[in-house]
Structures are given as structure tokens and as C-alpha cells.
């Protein structure tokens, strides 16, 4: 059993075209599934959950800003990924932890822990989830790109983003209707519990998709990468600096909004 699991996470240089197509399709399905979990633990859903356990506007705003803070870990995660033979194992493991933390948030109101403890638990779970998400972001993107030919990359990413957006919109409407139905019946805690149970099934599909995706062998840099190089190398590239400034401004505007 252990050998079979190890084989699943191994890189391979003998991947057929059919396996490449299947892996790309599974990445799209993974995006459609995972976005449901992210949707019900962010935005209006997160505000409603925090308010339900007794968090005020200020605390809710602080919790909502935690993902931006956690993104700083990407500097260190790039070093970890660059010095590893493959991205799949650590990506799947951290993705599972991320999803489980987000799912547990939905059941916090059921535990009736009191306002302070409940808010603290949600903040810790939310931080851990987005720490894991930020950590694997670089590796997951590289893993995805390794499965797509350069001339098809733009079209594939456009299709993936479109499908994810449709799934996110549809899922948000359905899940919000479910939550509203229970809220109007003064059973909002039960509503979050039902959504949590549905998301457990979605999580199983999500992680199964990630596990089944193949990972091709990638050529690594001969010289090991360290933290200093990871910071210096991008900053010496003018194009990267322009993109960095753009995303900094985008992040500030997005968080204000």
C-alpha cells in the first residue's frame, strides 16, 4: 500500500499524450471544486460566519486581511520547491490541510465555544489555511504549466479560468440560497453545518483530482537556490519589477474595496 502511494506521487518521464490530456482536465475539475470551498469561506460568507460567532466589524476585517499577510511565505516556498525533485507530494499534502482548515471553520458555530474562543479558532484556521495555500501556490502553478505546451498555455489557462468562474458563480448562488433558507428560518448555524457537509464531499473530489494528476520530470537548476537568491533574482528583472508594482497596487485597491 505504501509503495503504491509513493508511486502516485513520483515524477515520470514516460507520460502518454492521453495522460497529459487527462491531467489537464483534472486540473480544471480541481479548480471548479476547490473554488466552492474558497467561496463559502471568504467574502460575504466569511463575514456572516464571523458575525454569527460574535465578531465585530473590525475583527472581521482583520480576519479577511489575513490571506494577504500569509502571501509573504511564497518567498520561502519558492526555495523549497526549487530544491525538490517534484512538486506533487507537498502540493497535495498542503492542499489537503488547507481544505480541511477551511471546512472546520464552517463547523465552529456548532461547537458553541463562546464569542472570543470561536473568533480565535476561526482566525487560526483561516491563517493556517491561507498559509498552506500561499505556500503551494508557486509549486502548483509550475506543476500545471509543466503539463501544457507553450503554444497552448494561453488558451488552456483561459478555459480553466472561465470554467472556474462559472463554477464559482453557480456554486455561490446555490450555496447562498441554501444558507438564506436556513437564516430566514432562524437556523443559520444549521445552514453552515449543511454547507460544511456538502463541501466535505466537494473536498474529496478536489483532492482525488489532484492525486490523480501526473507530474512530468522537470529540469532543475544545478546550483541550489537559497533565500537570498530567491529575493535578488526577481528584483534584478525589470519586467518582474513592473509586475510586482502592478500587483502591489492591485492588492491595496482590492483590500480597500
Region spans (language model):
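Transmembrane alpha-helix termini and helix-breaking/packing motifs in multi-pass membrane transporters
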Residues: 44-52, 79-83, 106-114, 168-190
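Short helix-loop-helix connector
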Residues: 53-55, 85, 144-149
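Hydrophobic core of transmembrane alpha-helices in multi-pass small-molecule transporters
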Residues: 32, 36, 101-108, 115-136, ...
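Cytoplasmic helix-loop-helix junction between adjacent transmembrane helices
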Residues: 129-162
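Helix-loop boundary and gating motifs at the non-cytosolic
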Residues: 2-81, 88-98, 103-106, 164, ...
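Juxtamembrane helix-start elements in MFS-like secondary transporters
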Residues: 56-64, 118, 122, 192
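A membrane-interface helix-boundary motif in multi-pass transporters
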Residues: 87-89, 118, 177-201
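Helix-loop junctions on the cytosolic side of multi-pass membrane transporters
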Residues: 192, 202-224
Amino acid at each position: 500500500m505504501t509503495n503504491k502511494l509513493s508511486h502516485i506521487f513520483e515524477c515520470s518521464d514516460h507520460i502518454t499524450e492521453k495522460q497529459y490530456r487527462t491531467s489537464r482536465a483534472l486540473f480544471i475539475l480541481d479548480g471548479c471544486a476547490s473554488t466552492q470551498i474558497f467561496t463559502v469561506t471568504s467574502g460575504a460568507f466569511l463575514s456572516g460566519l464571523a458575525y454569527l460567532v460574535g465578531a465585530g466589524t473590525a475583527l472581521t476585517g482583520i480576519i479577511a486581511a489575513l490571506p494577504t499577510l500569509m502571501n509573504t511565505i511564497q518567498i520561502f516556498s519558492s526555495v523549497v520547491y526549487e530544491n525538490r525533485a517534484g512538486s506533487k507530494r507537498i502540493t497535495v499534502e498542503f492542499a489537503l490541510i488547507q481544505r480541511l482548515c477551511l471546512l472546520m471553520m464552517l463547523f465552529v458555530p456548532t461547537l458553541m465555544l463562546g464569542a472570543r474562543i470561536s473568533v480565535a479558532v476561526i482566525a487560526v484556521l483561516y491563517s493556517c489555511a491561507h498559509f498552506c495555500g500561499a505556500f503551494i501556490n508557486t509549486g502548483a502553478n509550475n506543476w500545471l504549466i509543466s503539463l501544457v505546451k507553450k503554444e497552448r498555455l494561453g488558451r488552456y489557462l483561459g478555459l480553466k479560468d472561465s470554467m472556474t468562474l462559472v463554477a464559482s458563480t453557480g456554486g455561490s448562488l446555490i450555496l447562498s440560497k441554501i444558507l438564506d433558507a436556513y437564516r430566514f428560518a432562524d437556523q443559520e448555524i444549521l445552514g453552515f453545518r449543511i454547507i460544511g457537509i456538502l463541501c466535505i464531499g466537494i473536498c474529496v473530489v478536489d483532492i482525488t483530482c489532484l492525486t490523480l494528476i501526473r507530474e512530468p520530470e522537470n529540469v532543475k537548476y544545478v546550483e541550489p537556490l537559497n533565500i537570498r537568491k530567491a529575493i535578488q533574482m526577481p528584483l534584478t528583472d525589470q519586467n518582474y519589477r513592473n509586475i510586482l508594482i502592478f500587483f502591489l497596487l492591485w492588492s491595496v485597491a482590492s483590500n480597500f474595496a
